[in-house]
Amino acid sequence: MSKYQKICTNVKISEIHFKNGTIDIYFKDSDEYNLLIACADCCSESWFELFVDDPIDQIIGKKIQSVQYVKDIDLPPSGVQECDINHVYRINFTDDTHYDFILRNSSNGYYDGWLEIHKKKILKKLII
């Protein structure tokens, strides 16, 4: 069982918003969305990066089955701090495809980053 229980599953993805530290995944006919956050320990910095030939908007229309950690990889130094750790995460879909992305963390070598997933409600706009 995935440790990321807050992920919305079996609902079509309708929209994606990607920023360095967050990925917002919105779902068709739903008042909920998932917020994926690149978290960091006290003296480090974390952010998401995508693989060059793998645009994230290709997951629109798919249904998420699970999210999992895959492996650590070597990448060119980020130059943010002294040491980098690069975690590959995978979103698995119900059609047996997947999408990989990178959570990068840079620190003095004593700290690391991690992925958090939050389930959020879409705030309705009031029309007055």
Question: Could you describe each region identified by the protein language model?
Answer:
Residues 1-128:
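Surface-exposed, interaction-prone regions used to assemble/regulate multi-protein complexes
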